[in-house]
Amino acid sequence: MDFSLTEEQELLLASIRELITTNFPEEYFRTCDQNGTYPREFMRALADNGISMLGVPEEFGGIPADYVTQMLALMEVSKCGAPAFLITNGQCIHSMRRFGSAEQLRKTAESTLETGDPAYALALTEPGAGSDNNSATTTYTRKNGKVYINGQKTFITGAKEYPYMLVLARDPQPKDPKKAFTLWWVDSSKPGIKINPLHKIGWHMLSTCEVYLDNVEVEESDMVGEEGMGFLNVMYNFEMERLINAARSTGFAECAFEDAARYANQRIAFGKPIGHNQMIQEKLALMAIKIDNMRNMVLKVAWQADQHQSLRTSAALAKLYCARTAMEVIDDAIQIMGGLGYTDEARVSRFWRDVRCERIGGGTDEIMIYVAGRQILKDYQNK
């Protein structure tokens, strides 16, 4: 088994490091975080340099790359301390290529190329329907050749920043109850839409919002994918999202580890660097083991994606392990850095707030255990 990177991958990671460290120092991200400002300059730079468009076909303004390369790049972005949770450009385009119309794909690609930002927010969750999307009550109805969407969504990431939303809505009278949900392409500026940002522990650089839809009018052509297939399309989206979650968690953990190791060499206590103490050495050694495990897990699942293998179990386990373990590593980094680690002057405190979301978004830890555990039992039922 060859663990070495290709020359192209080495050059890509070096270019990411140079771009971020040269143009976007920690002070930039700290200011955006403290002010709740979306870092448009950063996103524009990623798009202009092709980083946020990796894996997207050239015809849509992207750079072809396999999933292993994409995950290496994503880990490198967060390893540099940058908010990798903003990068869903390629994911948006991939979803539209899989089940969107030609016009929806065109809008997605053009919007992303023009702004550098993802084109749409995914509006799934509702006050009474989080992990259980089947309980969603937002409806779509037809009248006089138009379609009207009514309901409330919550915890919608990027609803304030992105120009469009993909809204999961229920047919109140479906012919087949198993095919009640359909995705709709909705312009966020349409009449009847009200967006209220929520205040959060972390992810301050990107809004998370309540979205109210009151008789929002859309066209039949705004249907995304086949009618009644919305839930299945969402499930496809989740598997790749979970791998992405795992990759960016891993990068943040690695950045926190490196900050803690440098601090342990520099901080003098009782006449010597604190890194000379065996308790600090033990923490760093265990952190290094965890990071190695996380990286290997992410790259294995990415390889499986490149081989067109099912990611149902492996992506769920990767997200579960990496999100939990990243929190452990970052928490240990804060402990090593002491009081400084608990202040906004140290970026590990931002990582601690931001990575905590990874244990919730894209499927909670508990749902990941359920998804993986159920599939494992099924796989061994007749063995």
UniProtKB/Swiss-Prot annotation:
One Pfam family named in its UniProt record: Acyl-CoA_dh_M
NCBIfam families: PRK12341.1
GO terms assigned for molecular function: acyl-CoA dehydrogenase activity; flavin adenine dinucleotide binding
TM region positions: none
BP-aspect Gene Ontology terms: 1-butanol biosynthetic process; fatty acid beta-oxidation using acyl-CoA dehydrogenase
Top-rank taxon, per record: Bacteria
Intrachain S-S bonds: none
InterPro entries in alphabetical order: Acyl-CoA_DH_CS, Acyl-CoA_Oxase/DH_mid-dom, Acyl-CoA_Oxase/DH_mid-dom_sf, AcylCo_DH-like_C, AcylCo_DH/oxidase_C, AcylCoA_DH/ox_N, AcylCoA_DH/ox_N_sf, AcylCoA_DH/oxidase_NM_dom_sf
Record's protein name: Probable acyl-CoA dehydrogenase YdiO
Assigned keywords, A-Z: FAD, Flavoprotein, Oxidoreductase
GO cellular component term, pick one: cytoplasm
EC number(s) reported in the record: 1.3.-.-
Keyword Flavoprotein: yes
Cofactor: FAD
Protein family: Belongs to the acyl-CoA dehydrogenase family.
Keyword Flavoprotein listed: yes
Catalytic activities: a 2,3-saturated acyl-CoA + A = a 2,3-dehydroacyl-CoA + AH2
Gene3D superfamilies: Acyl-CoA dehydrogenase/oxidase, N-terminal domain (1.10.540.10), Butyryl-CoA Dehydrogenase, subunit A, domain 2 (2.40.110.10), Butyryl-CoA Dehydrogenase, subunit A, domain 3 (1.20.140.10)
PROSITE patterns in UniProt: ACYL_COA_DH_1, ACYL_COA_DH_2
